[in-house]
Amino acid sequence: MAKNIQAIRGMNDYLPGETAIWQRIEGTLKNVLGSYGYSEIRLPIVEQTPLFKRAIGEVTDVVEKEMYTFEDRNGDSLTLRPEGTAGCVRAGIEHGLLYNQEQRLWYIGPMFRHERPQKGRYRQFHQLGCEVFGLQGPDIDAELIMLTARWWRALGISEHVTLELNSIGSLEARANYRDALVAFLEQYKDKLDEDCKRRMYTNPLRVLDSKNPEVQALLNDAPALGDYLDEESREHFAGLCKLLESAGIAYTVNQRLVRGLDYYNRTVFEWVTNSLGSQGTVCAGGRYDGLVEQLGGRATPAVGFAMGLERLVLLVQAVNPEFKADPVVDIYLVASGADTQSAAMALAERLRDELPGVKLMTNHGGGNFKKQFARADKWGARVAVVLGESEVANGTAVVKDLRSGEQTAVAQDSVAAHLRTLLG
């Protein structure tokens, strides 16, 4: 017997029972995006490798350790996208969407990183990202955060996420802080773990979010990033905080929040939770005003965020059990008798025409009434429409409310109207 081929470790199948809750959550997210006037953009999952090296940074963990990179048959180096911002910027430049224009875009889809799989962290994972181009004030930063807060309310998880904010300043201010931080860390080099020693010279700001408690204790005496901010960044951050306070959105300033990708400047933020163990970041982003120019476009202010959908689904299921998946089926059409199947299928098509948006499943494969009603229950149907030989002969159908058990014989021409009343 041939050996079964299984999914790649860290790349998961999502089965029908799971995709239903994903669809409801994604529908909620998309409705909110539409209410803010954001437009969808669809992007390739494979890009040229230099795009990510230039955008994310050569010495980041993502580029050094985590990217799925391969050579195609033409000898070109290609990479499965590890994040969405770089590809979105590339598309904006390529198609002339950015220069002297405002764009509010969102995308959704799989990303790929070669990490150690664990709950909430996978090698293929899904993100929803938002990117705004052409606006440089703190008001658009605030709008993005307000948009995410509206998501949490719609999903019933507001009490389980908290907002952390920081400003990492301009590129020049960050370079000055980098020098001061390296000078500090060099004094305690023997107390750093190997990962922090490596990062100290390649990407020292990443030492700030080390998970090592001994390193975190050491950093209590480190120079504060806030002391090195340029005046424009201070004013921008103060304006953002004021807007969030006016909107009633609570936040904490976390001066060790830096984000793991090199393209960020000024505002950075994360929504975090204590309900998912070590994988506490649900949504994160910030400003990247230099990235468009860095990738070959004209200087364009930009801000955005990405949200991990696997973690969001886990969080919703953990803290809001009332948020249920929509039923697969609203109406189940039961047909019994040798000559009823074609009539049942014809009635089903007519009902789909008259009741757009209603989910109707027709029984196939035979079975007595008991078996067919069991199938209706399995699929979560609220109503059954029953056709037997006598109903076909009389031009009627029996409509049964599967919750109350009440049933009514109805002329086939009136079934749609009766169902509208039952389904509300």
UniProtKB/Swiss-Prot annotation:
It is found in: Cytoplasm. One of its GO terms (cellular component) is cytoplasm. It comes from the Bacteria. It catalyses: tRNA(His) + L-histidine + ATP = L-histidyl-tRNA(His) + AMP + diphosphate + H(+). CDD domains: HisRS-like_core (cd00773), HisRS_anticodon (cd00859). It is an enzyme of class 6 (ligase). One of its GO terms (molecular function) is histidine-tRNA ligase activity. PROSITE patterns: AA_TRNA_LIGASE_II. Its main location: cytoplasm. The keyword Hydrolase does not apply. SUPFAM superfamilies: Class II aaRS ABD-related (SSF52954), Class II aaRS and biotin synthetases (SSF55681). Its EC number is 6.1.1.21. Keywords: Aminoacyl-tRNA synthetase, ATP-binding, Cytoplasm, Ligase, Nucleotide-binding, Protein biosynthesis. GO terms for biological process: histidyl-tRNA aminoacylation. The keyword Nucleotide-binding applies. Belongs to the class-II aminoacyl-tRNA synthetase family. NCBIfam families: hisS. Homodimer. This is Histidine--tRNA ligase. The gene is hisS.
